[in-house]
């Protein structure tokens, strides 16, 4: 009897296991991607002429920009005839490895854009439709939007709207966000928008349960109108559009815990700033991204940083650590930012202090291989970071 029961159980198990579709047990791990951006940002002609050499670097794509046509709130009409040479150049880029490229839009309000001026916004909408064509021409996955205002700030309140309630201005900004994304989707119905930061910027107010108190706290923040704009973008996003909070704050992380907390902030806590009817859409179409700031980890900045109190070997370990945990915690994209180095020009063509630091490429590759192979990082930086902080504190005392 026992033998018959065993055979019966074995047969049932075989049938049961055999009934599972192969793709339930043989799925590949989600592939994470690293894209490069920095002061070495390139233009379409450089990319076209150097794409084979560029693709030797350990990235999945780049964030680059068109000449002159790159400010979202430019109220001057863009003419396709003026942009056409760059559209042609974009179309000539023969990418192979770099399948995840983004064209950049900046948010500086250098032309006195008015959220309530329909003439301004009719122009901006047409400009963004043309920019959408540029994105498609270059076979880019989408747009990189930098909301930081390097000039006149469009996100302030009251600013020039002292005669209007905050709710009135926020609703208008939300409307413009809808129009903005709709225009960008004109030629790219399945668009990816990588923003250097979104609602994760407001992590210190999202846990306030009282909506009125939370709004009062928001009014004291930098870029107070930004949440309204992003809610408009979310509202107008087509089903195939992905919106990425790039979490620029990760520039300064010195522990794994900070990466994990940031992911939870973006994916969960930040939804306090999202209207209830949009939260299901937020969960479906907003991703958490992560950022790397090489200058910060390799002591290349002119301001004092923890990394300046680490040895060169420790600095590379610090960078590898951040690459590893950025890949671990991003939904899909990590953007790698640098200022005082150039990934694309040979050493003889850049200033001495802009040459790519020795070991940085190897550290990035090492972190990526460990992540992709499901291996642990293999070391902890807590001790060396604490020692560096003590040295830094001792210097100040």
Predicted stretch roles:
Residues 21-26:
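Boundary at the C-terminal end of the N-terminal hydrophobic targeting segment
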Residues 9-19:
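Bacterial N-terminal signal peptides
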Residues 27-397:
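Glycan-processing catalytic domains of CAZymes
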């Amino acid at each position: 009897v026992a033998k018959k029961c065993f055979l019966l159980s074995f047969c049932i198990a075989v049938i049961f296991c055999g009934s599972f579709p192969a793709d339930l047990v043989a799925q590949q791990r989600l592939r994470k991607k690293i894209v490069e951006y920095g002061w070495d940002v390139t233009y379409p002609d450089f990319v076209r002429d150097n794409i084979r050499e560029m693709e030797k670097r350990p990235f999945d794509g780049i964030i680059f920009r068109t000449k002159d046509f790159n400010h979202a709130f430019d109220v001057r009409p863009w003419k396709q005839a003026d942009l056409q040479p760059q559209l042609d150049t974009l179309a000539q880029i023969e990418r192979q490895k770099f399948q995840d490229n983004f064209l950049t839009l900046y948010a500086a309000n250098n032309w006195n854009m008015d959220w309530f001026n329909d003439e301004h916004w009719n122009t901006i909408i047409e400009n963004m439709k043309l920019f959408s064509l540029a994105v498609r021409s270059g076979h880019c996955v989408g747009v990189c939007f930098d909301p930081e205002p390097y000039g006149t700030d469009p996100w302030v309140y009251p600013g020039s709207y002292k005669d209007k309630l905050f709710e009135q201005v926020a609703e208008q900004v939300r409307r413009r966000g809808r129009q903005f994304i709709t225009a960008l989707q004109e030629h790219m119905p399945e668009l990816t928008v990588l923003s250097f930061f979104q609602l994760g910027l407001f992590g210190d107010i999202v846990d306030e349960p009282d909506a009125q108190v939370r709004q009062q706290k928001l009014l004291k923040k930098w870029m107070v109108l930004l949440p309204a704009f992003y809610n408009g973008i979310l509202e107008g996003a087509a089903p195939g559009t992905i919106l990425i909070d790039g979490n620029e704050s990760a520039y300064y992380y010195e522990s794994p815990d900070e990466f994990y907390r940031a992911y939870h902030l973006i994916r969960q806590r930040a939804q306090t700033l999202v209207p209830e009817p949009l939260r299901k859409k937020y969960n479906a179409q907003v991703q958490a991204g992560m950022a790397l700031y090489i200058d910060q980890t390799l002591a290349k900045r002119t301001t004092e940083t923890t990394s300046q109190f680490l040895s060169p070997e420790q600095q590379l370990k610090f960078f590898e650590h951040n690459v590893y945990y950025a890949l671990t915690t991003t939904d899909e994209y990590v953007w790698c930012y640098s200022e005082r180095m150039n990934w694309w020009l040979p050493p003889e063509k850049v200033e001495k202090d802009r040459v790519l630091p020795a070991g940085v490429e190897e550290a990035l590759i090492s972190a990526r291989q460990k992540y992709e192979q499901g291996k642990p990082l293999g070391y902890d930086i807590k001790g060396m970071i604490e020692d560096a902080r003590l040295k830094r504190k001792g210097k100040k005392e």
